[in-house]
């Protein structure tokens, strides 16, 4: 037997020719396109998907309020008075304060006419730093409650308070019951006689 078909030959354009095998005389062979372009795009698509997932997670973390979000717990720091005192004492040591003994009381006068009174306080001072500290139990009292022992502590700034006090004293004496200056008591008062008892006795005798 004799072969009638001829092997296919490919030209420079990628088309093949066959002689005698097809009734038309020529046959073209098509080759699949190269896949290099699609392989390079797959990693880029994966990166974009991963970036979108990361962005969605970040948005969920940053979002405040709304349905489905977890409640944020507010951190409350409880500070005690002892901790504040320790910090204060540490700061005072840096300033080099010294204790002043023999202080029985400290009175601080306010513009409202009241007195902040400390009884037997702990007083510390640093003249170089121009710092004075008073530690103890403080009581807010009226200026009238501290009289007359506080008179020798009043300065020029307390003249207005003294004037107010002098104006308030007459009002208090008028509103309240003032004691009698003559020393007479209400129990010793004798009622006035209205009827004549001598005439009544004569009528009974007749």
UniProtKB/Swiss-Prot annotation:
GO terms for molecular function: RNA binding. Disulfide bonds: none annotated. Keywords: Chaperone, Cytoplasm, Methylation, Nucleus, Phosphoprotein, Protein transport, Transcription, Transcription regulation, Transport. One of its GO terms (biological process) is negative regulation of protein localization to endoplasmic reticulum. It is found in: Cytoplasm; Nucleus. The modification Phosphoserine is found at residues 30, 173. The modification Phosphothreonine is found at residue 160. CDD domains: NAC_BTF3 (cd22055). Residues 1-42, 170-206 are annotated as: Disordered. It holds the Pfam family NAC. Residues 82-147 form the NAC-A/B domain. One of its GO terms (cellular component) is cytosol. Gene3D superfamilies: Nascent polypeptide-associated complex domain. The modification Omega-N-methylarginine is found at residue 19. The modification N6-methyllysine is found at residues 46, 54. Residues 183-198 have a biased composition (Acidic residues). When associated with NACA, prevents inappropriate targeting of non-secretory polypeptides to the endoplasmic reticulum (ER). Binds to nascent polypeptide chains as they emerge from the ribosome and blocks their interaction with the signal recognition particle (SRP), which normally targets nascent secretory peptides to the ER. BTF3 is also a general transcription factor that can form a stable complex with RNA polymerase II. Required for the initiation of transcription. Belongs to the NAC-beta family. Part of the nascent polypeptide-associated complex (NAC), which is a heterodimer of NACA and BTF3 (via NAC-A/B domains). NAC associates with ribosomes through the BTF3/NACB subunit. Both subunits can contact nascent polypeptide chains. This is Transcription factor BTF3. It comes from Homo sapiens. The gene is BTF3.
